[in-house]
Regions:
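Non-heme Fe(II) oxygenase catalytic core, chiefly the N-lobe of the double-stranded beta-helix
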Residues: 1-249, 255-290
């Protein structure tokens, strides 16, 4: 296994690994540790079936049931279908037309933050990129005066608030969830600054689209604090833009990274991904359920 840097601050490419080797527990553990340490890892030319993807996901941690069941694989409720190809593998591919929207896959669901697998089956020629931002590098670079506004800040993340917004966008195939699914993910109160359980480095932990409330602040003041922080974390120097190729696999850490889609400007071109969100192996609660 060879590791090559992709960005001065975070992100590495792993080479010398074949798809069939990803079922080896020791290798999966090494890949997970590398993702924790560097924020994300990229493996290219990895031919994954749904079966192989799930085998790897189970070695990386605890794969979570897809939070929108209609967009999951017919054999694996943990395997989410992303893209614009309609019905695939017995499920419907989830199409988010929102564009740039920074988040982490751990907020708003009460999960112990772990990693997410994104695997590219089909991608447009010159669109459909994914952005990653380093939350620990951003923390390390911020001066103490500005940090003081965030060290003790807490926010209420709500997956339902986020899903309602996504359902309102034109062209999406996402619907407002009914009561049983809404109750599945109670709001969580999370510290904006957290210590990564593996690296022990402080990181920012925030998903602005999911923020329902900033504890102790008016809506306007709280929103200003959150958006100023997100604009800082996502400055160009902290961001890596990935241009996908088919058979690319990225595994990213949901504390050390924020990520975002880019504009939906590839109508007429196919895009299809597997996504598996994997909660941390330490089930200790990161935030608190309300």
């Amino acid at each position: 296994m060879r590791v090559t840097s992709l960005h001065p601050l975070f992100g590495v490419e792993i080479s010398g690994v074949a798809a069939e080797n990803l079922s080896e527990p020791a290798l999966a553990t090494e890949i997970r540790h590398t993702a924790h340490e560097h924020g994300f890892v990229l493996l290219r030319g990895i031919r994954l079936t749904a079966d192989r993807a799930m085998t790897l996901a189970r070695l990386l941690g605890n794969p979570e049931i897809g939070y929108r069941p209609e967009f999951t694989h017919n054999q694996y409720p943990e395997l989410v279908l992303l893209g614009n190809m309609g019905e695939v593998d017995g499920g419907m591919a989830y199409l988010n037309t929102q564009g740039v929207e920074w988040h982490t896959d751990a907020t708003g669901k009460g999960l112990a933050p772990g990693v997410t697998m994104l695997y590219c089956l089909k991608t447009p020629m010159e669109a459909g990129d994914t952005l990653f931002a380093s939350t620990d590098a951003a923390y390390a670079a911020l001066d103490d005066d500005r940090l003081s506004a965030y060290r003790d800040l807490k926010v209420v993340h709500s997956f339902n608030v986020h899903n309602d917004k996504v359902a309102s966008f034109g062209g999406t195939n996402v619907s407002v969830q009914q009561e049983a699914l809404r109750n599945r993910y109670p709001d969580t109160t999370d510290p904006v600054v957290t210590i990564h359980p593996f690296t022990r480095r402080p990181c920012f932990f925030i998903s602005h689209q999911l923020v329902k409330e900033v504890v102790g602040y008016s809506q306007k003041h709280g929103n200003d604090l959150v958006m100023n922080l997100v604009r800082y974390i996502t400055k160009k120097r902290f961001v890596f833009r990935h241009r996908w190729k088919e058979e690319d696999l990225i595994i990213f850490d949901n504390i050390a990274c924020l990520h975002s889609a880019t504009e939906y400007d590839y109508e007429g071109q196919d895009r299809l991904f597997y996504q598996i969100i994997i909660s941390g192996q330490n089930k200790a609660q990161h935030g608190t359920r309300d």
